[in-house]
Curated annotation (Swiss-Prot):
PROSITE patterns (UniProt xref): RIBOSOMAL_L14
Subunit structure, interactors included: Part of the 50S ribosomal subunit. Forms a cluster with proteins L3 and L19. In the 70S ribosome, L14 and L19 interact and together make contacts with the 16S rRNA in bridges B5 and B8.
This protein's encoding gene: rplN
Gene3D superfamilies: Ribosomal protein L14
Taxonomic lineage of the native organism: Bacteria, Pseudomonadati, Pseudomonadota, Alphaproteobacteria, Sphingomonadales
Natural source organism: Zymomonas mobilis subsp. mobilis (strain ATCC 31821 / ZM4 / CP4)
Name listed for the protein in its UniProt record: Large ribosomal subunit protein uL14
NCBIfam families with a match to the protein in the record: rplN_bact
Gene Ontology MF terms in the entry: large ribosomal subunit rRNA binding; structural constituent of ribosome
GO cellular component, one term: cytosolic large ribosomal subunit
Length: 123
């Protein structure tokens, strides 16, 4: 579960290293987000020559959470940390050209096919 003020690792090569959630999209009273949800983030730590700079505000898709992900078949997936992929606000395409680490199959149901195709492993 991701809420406001949560710090996340960035799982792409956009140049950002750490981001902070500043808004959960999807309703005025919505407080938490999970895998596949879109959030608004602020870049807190960035690489020197990346596409994004520290302080930039972007949208991001959550690809990994430390909170359990329960599936219909009874299996449970959990990761060591929280991670997101920065996306373009208008097109919804990832800003980076590579994805690092595994992503979950639930992204397919949310129509984030580009992230699934770039990921090295889909769990």
């Amino acid at each position: 579960m991701i809420q406001m003020q949560t710090n996340l690792d960035v799982a792409d090569n956009s140049g950002a290293k750490r981001v902070q959630c500043i808004k959960v999209l999807g309703g005025s009273k919505r407080r938490t987000a999970t895998v596949g949800d879109v959030i608004v983030v602020s870049v807190k730590e960035a690489a020197p020559r990346g596409r994004v700079k520290k302080g930039d505000v972007h949208r991001a898709v959550i690809v990994r959470t430390a909170k359990d992900i329960h599936r219909a078949d009874g299996s449970v997936i959990r990761f060591d940390g929280n991670a997101a992929v920065l996306i373009n606000k208008t097109s919804g395409e990832p800003i980076g050209t590579r994805i690092f680490g595994p992503v979950v199959r639930e992204l397919r149901a949310r129509n984030h096919m580009k992230i699934i195709s770039l990921a090295p492993e889909v769990l």
